[in-house]
Amino acid sequence: MKPLVLGAALAGVLAQASSDRPPTRNVGTMSDLMVKIIYPASDALFYIESRTPKTDAEWTVLEGQALMVAESANLLMLPGRARDQKQWMADAKLMLDAGADAVAAAKKKDVEAIVALSDRLMESCTTCHKNYRPNYGKPPLD
């Protein structure tokens, strides 16, 4: 009986803690997030071989770009942005994991590791776009 009481008390504390959190508010549109944050940040990772950082300052910028990719995945999972709790969240989690790994690789200045995670990052983009972006991959109509 004690574990049940403890569990109920813990659930009450957690519910109170989440209700004390200030509400989030989406400021930009999905297009704003993609075009102004995610695309430029992910491009820095996708094109690492042709735009390899040479200085500590450039590596710091790349680490920031990788961090933007990872944290943008968290933004995509917020209420009001997440389209569903299954596929959308799975795609965002792929992006989060690839971005987090890119942050770790950038801290080590490991170009090869960033190149190696490109496929994972691209998979998160393409599967999400196929499912949620109308006409993705289709030729434009004349």
Language-model features, listed with the residues they occupy:
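Positively charged n-region of N-terminal signal peptides that target proteins for export
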Residues: 1-3
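Hydrophobic h-region of N-terminal signal peptides that target proteins for export
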Residues: 5-17
